[in-house]
Amino acid sequence: MTRCDLCNETHQSHLPTLRQLYEEAFPLSERRPWSDLEQLIGAQGAYHFFLLEHPELGVVGFVTLWRFDDFYYGEHFAILPQLRNHRLGEQTLQTIREYIGHAPLYFEVEPETHSEMAGRRINYYERNGFHIVKRDYLQPPYHHDESGVPLYIMSSEQGERDFIERVCQTLVEQVYPHF
């Protein structure tokens, strides 16, 4: 099976497809405004927007990663709907793990009580070696007129409680906007 590659050069021609995927895959409360995302894409620093490319299929999705001193945070990860259930996500997680080395990787996910899809997403991450490490996490709002969103934190490592609390504090302070 051919794997997907991470491409950190997002060509302008791909942005309409990626924007549509971003806006369809994530509810408004779990995504920043597209204009803010475009600013992050062009900036240097901890934020990385990776186009997911397959040699035979072309662009299949994207993943956004934040690189911190001793861990990575996957803010958004989506595969085009027509290409889901073909193990592309699994291949992408493997590619991400190769890219980040031994650093722990964290994702936020909706609780399984939110929807059937949320439960399937948790199962997907668990099948790929992730564990729920925090169930009482409140994602700060992306928009000034909204409240935080209750989510779980999943990790590629079990981690010590103090480290997980520091991860959550880093996300609150450095990833989300402050109003």
Where are these regions (language model features)?
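Conserved GNAT acetyl-CoA-binding A-motif
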Residues: 100-116, 122
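Conserved acetyl-CoA-binding loop-helix of GNAT-fold acetyltransferases
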Residues: 79, 85-99
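Conserved beta-strand in the GNAT
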Residues: 51, 57-66, 71-78
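A short helix-loop-beta-strand connector motif used in the catalytic cores of GNAT acetyltransferases and
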Residues: 41-51, 147
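Short amphipathic alpha-helix that is part of the acyltransferase structural core
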Residues: 1-36, 53, 151, 163-179
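Charged helix-capping and loop-helix junction motifs
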Residues: 90-92, 118-124
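Conserved beta strand-loop-helix elements of the APE1-like EEP
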Residues: 153-159
